[in-house]
Design a protein with these regions (language model features):
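Helix-loop-strand module that forms the ligand-binding subsite of alpha/beta enzymes
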Residues: 1-80
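Glycine-rich phosphate/pyrophosphate-binding loop and the adjoining helix
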Residues: 75-122
Length: 122
């Protein structure tokens, strides 16, 4: 993480991506976020006010029964705590290679998030 902290601090936009495992973000994604604690002080956070985006994939067809909505709420709570700006969230059902490409509406949402992300970066 020592190599990543300066990159996180200098980033204009932080995009998190995770599969949904056991009804929330993957353990690896959550561990990555948990380690941001090292960037906190009693007065402030080095990530306060950053722009964030989230991309999720889950196996079920429903964001509620898959736990995708739990992952989204975790992300929203994190951004609220950091006083961050949510640039966008893209989520959808995808279990196998190529599943996303078969969903034009999901591809369009991902494309639009990319445009928003590009606009958020000075």
């Amino acid at each position: 993480m020592e190599a990543l902290y300066p990159k996180l601090i200098s980033a204009d936009l932080i995009v998190l991506s995770s599969p949904v495992y056991w009804f929330t973000l993957s353990a690896q994604a959550k561990l990555f976020i948990d380690r941001w604690y090292a960037l906190e002080s009693p007065q402030d956070s080095a990530l306060r006010g950053k722009d964030f985006a989230l991309v999720l994939a889950y196996g079920d067809t429903d964001p509620y029964t898959s736990g995708g909505i739990n992952a989204i709420h975790t992300f929203q709570d994190m951004c609220r705590y950091l006083r961050g700006n949510i640039v966008g969230i893209v989520y959808g059902s995808a279990s196998n290679l190529g599943d996303v490409q078969k969903q034009p509406e999901l591809m369009e949402r991902a494309y639009e998030l990319g445009k928003k992300a590009g606009a958020a970066v000075p």
